[in-house]
Amino acid sequence: HIDHIGANRPLAEATGALIAIGTQDAPSLLDPTLNLTRALGRLAMGKASPGADILLVEGDKVYAGSICLEVLHTPGHTPGSISLLGEGIVFTGDTIFAQGGIGRTDFPGGSYDELIKSIEGKLLALPDETCVYPGHGPPSTIGRERMCLSR
């Protein structure tokens, strides 16, 4: 959504960074209804993202310098939502947040059932000490989120 893609164009132009996204979400980069720029109207003017350079699927590897992150397909917030798993860390985007928060599923393509499957089947299957870095808010751990989500 716009809160995660609004800087794609200037960042890519300034640095040569490639735009990577879960395969099923690639159309949303260019569709103002799916990425919510249309809903924001004037607030989103000039925030259009370029298309994807890299389409990611489960098991792909993404490198940031010497850091290797594995793609976990964690649909629910969007059909192509991904989390990135590294050694002792996971970047969860809008799938889970600290203190038991979970991603919204009321936007186009969202699915509560898929989100819960992603959380229970993939993220909560990780070791308790795995550090969680969500797309919004403070970091947490899988163990802490497992406790919060079980309430």
Feature locations, PLM:
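Metallo-beta-lactamase
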Residues: 35-40, 61, 67-151
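Active-site HxH/HxHxD metal-binding segment of metal-dependent hydrolases
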Residues: 1-62, 147-151
